[in-house]
Amino acid sequence: MTSSASSPQDLEKGVNTLENIETLPQQGSIAGVSQGFPNIQEIYSDRDFITLGSSTYRRRDLLNALDRGDGEEGNCAKYTPHQFANPVPLGLASFSLSCLVLSLINANVRGVTDGKWALSLFMFFGGAIELFAGLLCFVIGDTYAMTVFSSFGGFWICYGYGLTDTDNLVSGYTDPTMLNNVIGFFLAGWTVFTFLMLMCTLKSTWGLFLLLTFLDLTFLLLCIGTFIDNNNLKMAGGYFGILSSCCGWYSLYCSVVSPSNSYLAFRAHTMPNAP
């Protein structure tokens, strides 16, 4: 850095001079060394002043000029952070719709027992879209929602793939009891997972808590009904699944409705001791 020690410039009635500022310790330096580059000047700063090459400025005035001080219009463009949309309603929509259709089939509503036509719904809307919502929750830093939506998105894909009987997943079993046991193991695993996620909603909203409560009962009844091949238990699981879906619809509506877009605005009721 080049400076003229023979002609100090008074900064404020002789209190501080350019010569004094240039001899400050370089702890506040924010620029590199100018060795070998004669056209590059160094930058030093202390509490009140900033030195740019051979010129010294008051810190307050320089920040005001850069539009970082008292709000005066400066020459530097302001940085506006990008706002991401909330992906949770999308995850709730894909889960609630798929759960409702499957539960109606499990409950044998209107005598329906074969749900192969809903395969596309399970794999694409319940599976792919919910998995996509979970990945978007990863982007916004919501670990819980990412885990729940991504996991259940995988569940719907697995369930739909099993219905296709690709690679003889079902028809390859010659013993119906063994097939029921394998499916029962699958449902038992999801019963445990859902219970763990349920324990993480004790300080959340009532809608989410009841959704996972009814869903865990759904998996439990379907699991037991599959193990013992009892259709009444499977139907009971279907009815609990309908309740779980209704809780999902309510939570979905509460998360997207507002006085600006609807005259009928509900609010999500929080659990006791919720933060």
Swiss-Prot record:
This is Ammonia transport outward protein 3. GO terms for biological process: ammonium transmembrane transport; monoatomic ion transport; nitrogen utilization; transmembrane transport. Induction: Expression is under the control of the ADR1, CAT8, and GCN4 transcription factors. Also induced by external ammonia and in rho(0) cells. It is found in: Cell membrane. It comes from the Eukaryota. The modification Phosphoserine is found at S4. Keywords: Ammonia transport, Cell membrane, Ion transport, Membrane, Phosphoprotein, Transmembrane, Transmembrane helix, Transport. The keyword Metal-binding does not apply. One of its GO terms (cellular component) is cell periphery. It holds the Pfam family Gpr1_Fun34_YaaH. Belongs to the acetate uptake transporter (AceTr) (TC 2.A.96) family. The keyword Cell division does not apply. Residues 106-120, 203-207, 258-275 are cytoplasmic. The gene is ATO3. GO terms for molecular function: acetate transmembrane transporter activity; ammonium channel activity. The chain crosses the membrane at residues 85-105, 121-141, 182-202, 208-228, 237-257. Transporter protein required for ammonia export. Induced in rho(0) cells, probably to eliminate the excess ammonia that arises because of a potential defect in ammonia assimilation in those cells. It is a multi-pass membrane protein. Residues 1-84, 142-181, 229-236 are extracellular.
